[in-house]
Amino acid sequence: MTNSNRIKLTWISFLSYALTGALVIVTGMVMGNIADYFQLPVSSMSNTFTFLNAGILISIFLNAWLMEIIPLKTQLRFGFILMVLAVAGLMFSHSLALFSAAMFVLGLVSGITMSIGTFLITQLYEGRQRGSRLLFTDSFFSMAGMIFPMVAAFLLARSIEWYWVYACIGLVYLAIFILTFGCEFPALGKHAQHSQAPVAKEKWGIGVLFLAVAALCYILGQLGFISWVPEYAKGLGMSLNDAGALVSDFWMSYMFGMWAFSFILRFFDLQRILTVLAGIAAVLMYLFITGTQAHMPWFILTLGFFSSAIYTSIITLGSQQTKVASPKLVNFILTCGTIGTMLTFVVTGPIVAHSGPQAALLTANGLYAVVFVMCFALGFVSRHRQHSSPAAH
């Protein structure tokens, strides 16, 4: 594989995470405007975003098999057509059913793209380089989470309709579409050359279950928290711009945290530092929820930084539970994380409707505590210490 081809594939991976990040994170910013557009209460409007998350979940789950049947380049190009149709549906329809369908299609497209992005990184890089590349790739999720809420606040403050936010997100996929030209993708399944000897199957072990629960609770907690921060902040008397700034601050420090931890993690045992980070994140989230308005930006900045490496470390630890990194195992943990994404508004919507945004934030805090417990318990059963040493060379 040529170096320019590897660079193109790596950038497709980066942008695939940015696309999913933009779609998922911008929800909290535009939810109120979309609720007004359809004349619905915010809590019931949030349920329709479950279609976006369901699309992401279904596509990541199915793509473990689809990648072996349909070439990756074909999937990405077909995804671009679906993206254009979905954004057009949002712009020209006033029907809630069509809005839900468009959200589902956007979820399908971003889930397929993200699973391809994750697969490409695990194929292109090995050993410790894989972990740091995955962390750097995941930082594009946060970068989109920092940029697009600011774009949304800029457009909404100027009374520009909410659907233009999704048109802007579509530009990320346009870049992916352009990169597919003149680019060779790894072949899989029936398209691949079967020269290698089959790899013996390994049992996953109970550590994978702990990591799967941690992945689900972490993503559900993180998105449950960040989706309702704008509404919570507005309830405290903050302006839309200040509320948006809290979300952007979180993702900005999350992004810087990922860059920092891609260097820091190599000096520590991954399970131990993951447990410490999960504990610190749970405490910082509690301080944000119970703290004064003046301290909120500082708590959310430090929360973003210290929680940045948690999810990627969970995935990396998962890949180290077997001697040979299993794509299905990694996909299983990714799927559990995506179930957390799908459940975000299913779980938090009724809580907000019944008890308000602060109750949703406290629920998220409880989920972070579960992540800490799972990571701590993993220390007694993890196999990463016996499997990760060869990867270091």
Curated annotation (Swiss-Prot):
Pfam families: MFS_1 (PF07690). It is a multi-pass membrane protein. The chain crosses the membrane at residues 11-31, 51-71, 78-98, 101-121, 134-154, 162-182, 206-226, 245-265, 273-293, 298-318, 332-352, 361-381. GO terms for cellular component: plasma membrane. It comes from the Bacteria. Disulfide bonds: none annotated. Keywords: Cell inner membrane, Cell membrane, Membrane, Transmembrane, Transmembrane helix. GO terms for molecular function: transmembrane transporter activity. It is found in: Cell inner membrane. InterPro entries: MFS, MFS_dom, MFS_trans_sf, MFS_TsgA, MFS_TsgA-like. Belongs to the major facilitator superfamily. TsgA family. NCBIfam families: PRK03699.1. This is Protein TsgA. It comes from Salmonella schwarzengrund (strain CVM19633).
